[in-house]
UniProtKB/Swiss-Prot annotation:
Source organism of the structure: Bacillus velezensis (strain DSM 23117 / BGSC 10A6 / LMG 26770 / FZB42) (Bacillus amyloliquefaciens subsp. plantarum)
Residues at which substrate binds: 56, 192, 198, 319
Major place of residence: cytoplasm
Protein family: Belongs to the phosphoenolpyruvate carboxykinase (ATP) family.
Reaction catalyzed: oxaloacetate + ATP = phosphoenolpyruvate + ADP + CO2
Pathway where it operates: Carbohydrate biosynthesis; gluconeogenesis
GO biological process: gluconeogenesis
Residues bound to Mn(2+): 198, 217, 254
GO cellular component: cytosol
Descriptive protein name: Phosphoenolpyruvate carboxykinase (ATP)
Upper lineage: Bacteria, Bacillati, Bacillota, Bacilli, Bacillales
Entries under SUPFAM superfamilies matching the protein: PEP carboxykinase N-terminal domain, PEP carboxykinase-like
EC number: 4.1.1.49
Amino acid sequence: MKLVDLTADLQALLASPNVHHNLSAPKLTEKVISRNEGTLTSTGAVRATTGAYTGRSPKDKFIVREQSTENQIDWGAVNQPISEEAFEKLYAKVVSYLKQRDELFVFEGFAGADEKYRLPITVVNEFAWHNLFARQLFIRPETDERDTQAQPFTILSAPHFKADPETDGTHSETFIIVSFEKRVILIGGTEYAGEMKKSIFSIMNFLLPQQDILPMHCSANVGEKGDVALFFGLSGTGKTTLSADADRKLIGDDEHGWSDSGVFNIEGGCYAKCINLSEEKEPQIFRAIRFGSVLENVVLDEKTGEADYDNSFYTENTRAAYPIEMIGNIVQPSIAGHPQAIVFLTADAFGVLPPISKLTKEQAMYHFLSGYTSKLAGTERGVTSPQTTFSTCFGSPFLPLPAHVYAEMLGHKIDEHGVQVFLVNTGWTGGGYGVGERMKLSYTRAMVKAAIEGRLNQTDMTADSIFGLRSPVHVPGVPDEVLQPENTWSDKQAYNEKALFLANEFKENFKKFSHADSIAKAGGPLV
């Protein structure tokens, strides 16, 4: 199928009389209720459930193998290839399916808060609540801002359309397929709205480096003096909690680009985890869940419509989507200067990484490529033991290009702008999980505050002999003995054994980066 034919099909679909273009949040909310797609909560938010899929489906994600991009993609388990022929057949089926719907909902907006680098996007939805999600998550145009000269990336979302693996070349009835050449994303067989968000992020992770912009899976905030801080970290490391700071304004909570001008948010909204949410712990998120926001897979009280955030009946991965303006203390537009500090967050359940370390450029590249944290997994007898988790660049599922591309860009920008980089362990101290205790949040906040305010740039440091990490000997508000993990363990031999174990885990994981020997030697464990 030629691009001109595909474009004509798409234009015909968008011109259909059953298509609603750019409905407001109130109108979309009306549609959600009248179409029985969801219910209103006691605060006026829309609540929808997603059926069998309550999270992303990475094994069902494909990139079309096309001549123009074939040699750029890092093909493998994350970026699975699918043929152009299979894509075109499935595209025709999805378009035909959507044409037969009674109603369709279209959002036309952008990804990228910096006007110089933003990407026009068109989202075509079978569900009204999905369109409300897209409207609140991406960047909404002010008046008629869309540049008609730039061809948008188009998402065709058909949750009730199911693929046939035998004839369609998919692994299951579910599919998320990206064609960079055709600028189309097909999503079918899943009602999980997060697939739309992360598909656009994957697109930006491919396009932005071509403009010498580093795409990043991180949160970002800025102080009164314009000092920008970035926070990288996998789930459970405290990224959301630590980047929400009353003394600093939020740039964005999840996806950013770093250009020659500075940092910009890729999105116009937030997609926050809701499990165990409370007004006391996270007041900004709690108060943002009101009319215009979307709750996904959250249990409601049948009589009152109140959300039960502690209930994981549908999934632990309960979510809220809302425009960033719904929380206070933000930067508008979501753009700021170059970062002064970068914080890599890890929750080390083995209790051997220092609570805070200042990294060299090579160590920063090493830990960026590693993307380490640990998770607690239950065993048959109910005992939990830590497991190492590594996610390249803290965002492995969303990286179409080889990892070294992103790491080298980071190293260059650290050099160019003199950025201070810190590794912060929000995990265990005084022993591993089951022996020690979780690092006190007040200590972590004090360390992060000192780091991003530049108060650790000239302080005395001491280096450990296993990881080669340099830690401050003193941080205001934190007991000195806590800063050196070995000192908090009563059994020094046990500490040494566990530290050597984790160092070896790092080295084993890093073997997949065959191109990065120099980084491993200069930035990895010493043993």
